[in-house]
Amino acid sequence: MGMNTSIYRMKNGTLLGVLLCLVALWPSRVCAENSATNPAQMLQKLDESLTQKAQYEQQKLQRIAQLKAQLPRTFDRKRYALLRQLYKEYASYQYDSAYTYAQQMNQMALQLCSQDFHIEAQCAQVFCLLSAGLFHEGVATLQPIDIAHATAPYRKLYFITAARLYYDLADYTHAAPYVGEYIAKGSVFTDSLLHYLPRNSDEWLYASGLQAMKWRHFTASNHYFKQLLSRNHVDAHTRAIITSCMGWTKLFQHEKAAAICLLAQAAIYDNVSATRETTALCTLARLLYEQGDIQRSTEYVRQSLQNANFYGAR
């Protein structure tokens, strides 16, 4: 996942909650206890998980097929809800399909004369664009969104999306003074978002952790992230984002053993949730190459490129 921040896959509902409870809780405990001392153990678990990639993907495709089968006999608000489910299934899986369903959500929102649904559909389009690396188009799509008459949940969604866009833009730019400017913009949107979130809720912890991480307040960010990871109901996709973020902080602090373990854990969660829009595996490959693990590094690069090409990242 991107320093992903999505949240951003953010972030995406709890469709994978049952799967998480069955197969994805143990890595977080292993890594939390042994992240600095057992990277080999986590890499072995990652290799084992990757052998089941086709199985996890088939589960996603079955869910998608079941949703699509309902479309011909579904109308009005129920149809919008179905389009939303299809968008969420594709959001971090395949750009073209995700964007198509985001557009269909927008068309349905206009038919229903729903300002809230219109905002949600526009935010979905922004998420697709930023996930594909189309940042200019993402900003152009975000700017006209009018939340003046939106209800609180959809204002919240707007702030989540805007923060994610500018944080990702900062990661992509890597050049002064723009990095600081984009982080500051993302932080302003995060401050607005936090007003809508109950303190210590899942979303509050994630938003606070991400904001602290972007300002490189790593002790604070990891404190928030660890609290969130300790909650058993958190889905696999969100866990992938959080552990990827924590891996990045350890990498920045030159704690490579801990970074490898956390990134391996993130890659496991990405695999379990059939996420194709991801950076954990690629970053992990680079670290392993530097350590001389050429065979594993080469395989992770191959799979990372396969994921990126399938997703449609630019």
Question: Which residues are covered by each model-predicted region?
Answer:
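Bacterial N-terminal signal peptides
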Residues: 17-25
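A "functional boundary" signal
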Residues: 2, 7-8, 27-314
